Amino acid sequence: MLASRMPDAVSLTWGLPSFQTPEYIRNGIIRVLQQDKDAGKYTLPDGLPDLRQQVVETHLNRTGIEVNADANVMIAAGNMQGLNTLFHTMMDPGDEVILTDPCFASHIQQIQLFNGEPVYWPLNDDWSLDIERLPELVTDKTQAVVIVSPSNPTGKIFSEAELRCVGEIARQNDFFVIIDDPYSDFVYDNNSSYFNLASVGELADHLIYLYSFSKSYAMSGWRLSYMILPEELKYEAMKVHDATMICAPRISQLAGLIALTEPSDHKQRFRTVLSDRRDLICQRLDTCSHVFDYRKPDGAYYLFPRIRTPHHNAKTFAIDLLQNSAVAVTPGSAFGPSGEHHVRMAFCVDEATINSAFDRIEAYFSNRC
């Protein structure tokens, strides 16, 4: 909010890619608007049948797991709305959801909105999962654990072995693993490092998978995602979804159907650009080693550097940086207790923005030395 009142500020805060929705989707939706007389109407609460059936095929291609369009697929207005529906469905006051620490800040807020308790699961120093710690956090009030891989805010990709352990602990203790997946199409260096726990069929009764169109298709403003979930849970979640949302916007669902069915190489192009931006921001951070140290992210488009220079806390550091160099970063404390003394930087912005931000950061801290 402070940055919005500074018109000359350079922002590395918002995880909003600089890409435009691909042309084939834009042109396709123009055709639909001209030809489909129902394009402005409601759909069924769980989404267009054609889109849900295409999700079945897409999920099979991505995971090797076959699901049922009517029993297991639900279309949401973005992963955040999908998660909001899930938490509303599964939580009573005082119930607990385990979050990696650091985690996506909105997950904390959503759980608290329903008078639930976020239970923080601190990551190891290299941002990997501390599997031995997880069983100690499970209680009779545990409803779920939320996993984002590649991670927001760290960019870490959790290993197959780690994720399988999480799934087994959830199965043994009868709670859900919720996979929030906005970033799996943005994996750098080693594509084989990414593992989707939704590909483990024996976990189907304890697993909820949410895939967002926002990042991979540059459709953040369209508000669209899909959920794969057990039939009984879908039945209950539909009651909440219908009462609060009715349905995801039909026009967005039609765009999603185009996105999934027509061939395009845009994901590879996006990934190449983001990989170059990751390299650039890491190079610029290397020149600021007296201010930050960091781990190079495996995926997504965030870094989570630790603040080395003297400071009180992450929030005051971020405010000071904004007020004195007109560069906006997100305080790490927003992402959980372990985020303190870190900041999040998004490298989904263009190269000129990255360079401008670090020119200012370097100038500010050189003047302080």
Regions found by a protein language model. Name each.
Residues L257, V273-C282, Y294-I307:
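Conserved glycine-rich beta-strand-loop-beta hairpin in the small C-terminal domain of fold type I
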Residues D125-S192:
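Active-site phosphate-binding strand-loop segment of PLP-dependent enzymes
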Residues A237-H241, L260-C282:
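Structural signature of PLP-dependent enzymes
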